[in-house]
Amino acid sequence: MLKSSRETKYEIENLGDVIHPVCCGLDIHKTWIYAAILIYNFEKKQIHWITTRVTSFKKKLDKLSKWLIVNGCKYICMESTGQYWIPVFDALEDAGLKPIVAHPKYLKVLSGKKSDPNDARWIAKAFACGRVVASFIPPKAIRNLRSLVRFMIKISHEATSNKNRARNCLTSLGLKLDDVFSDVFGKSSRSIINYIIAHPGEKFDVAPFVDKACKPPFAMIQDSIDKAIDAKQDAGTLLKLRKALERLDDAEKDIQELKGNITQQMGAYKKQLDLIRTVPGFDTDPFTAMRVLIEIGPDMKVFPTMKHFCSWAGVCPHHDSSAYKVKGRRISRSGTYLKPLLVNIAKAVVRSKNHPEISQRFNRIKNRRGYMKAIIAVCRMFLTAIWNILSKGEPYRADGFMPVNNGNNKAISISQALAYVRSRGYAIIDDNSGALTTTGSQGT
């Protein structure tokens, strides 16, 4: 069992409306974790502190969980400090406690009172009074899938970087394979590149390496290779090209392995995936719906309304105003992994004529606010649809969005029309007399 601080500390303070009279604040570091349990006495307006310090090893985290249970503390609040909070959160969750992770901006300590024990006490005070906004932490199974997907995205970025390095090497060697092949990293092109790397400066017949389904004629490919082959090819560039291609092959192999593992684990969420695939743009690639579900989680009850959901994803303007002055309306930086995916889907869907409810809204906003703001508005349409279909368990319906007023039922009086024309700088001339009109009746 952990040892608490040698002297328990009491404070006389009226915390006002206390939501959690018994809670704990954790100040997490790489090696040490400072814990402070707050016990509030409503009658005496008194705070009783019980503090301790533990290391971040697994056995010590289990002892920390038992220490919290012995002291009757069920709710624990901590900052989202890098990756350090993850093992602490997992250990407390496995022990049946209710840990809460919050953004550091909600837990800033007053200047001049900064220390690790004071940080833990401040976190406990803020959480007890309900001043902490909890971050969305999905279930453990989704968290594990999320880490795999994000790791796969990092590897795909590395694969793209290695493709660019390989293209630069081919350009330096004078091999203009992109002029004759649509895909430089296709089967035929890679076979030719591998032979050039293995036999530098040697001229050869490309016919055995080119697939029969390849569109460019053999003569054209042969001519392109013969012009580029040179006995004085730089050995360093060839080595760099070979290493870039090896890294590319390893990355693509890892991506396929991760995709297979993720797809297998996502079998438990088939119902939610089928619903998400009914949304326009999410039915082309099955892995797209998986990525979205892994980021948002299968349960929409954690978001009270679709507005909260869209705000969490970072596809709505933030509010920043003071003294009747609006300082900014830009979208937040939330949704680092979800937002780029939605933007790519939106750019493809708005070009389609199969979904007028989306393309009409996009064109209407684009004319007023610009292209990217209209794309973000379409992303919000996607999230609104996903929140509703997952909450209600119903597939996507195009008539779920408000119909667009096409302007056919607009009406204006003659006097209003004449006043509008005059406001635009036009002089109204009578058709019969040719004289300028001065009243609405003369213009008719």
Q: What residues fall within each predicted segment?
A:
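A detector of single, family-specific signature residues
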Residues: 1-444
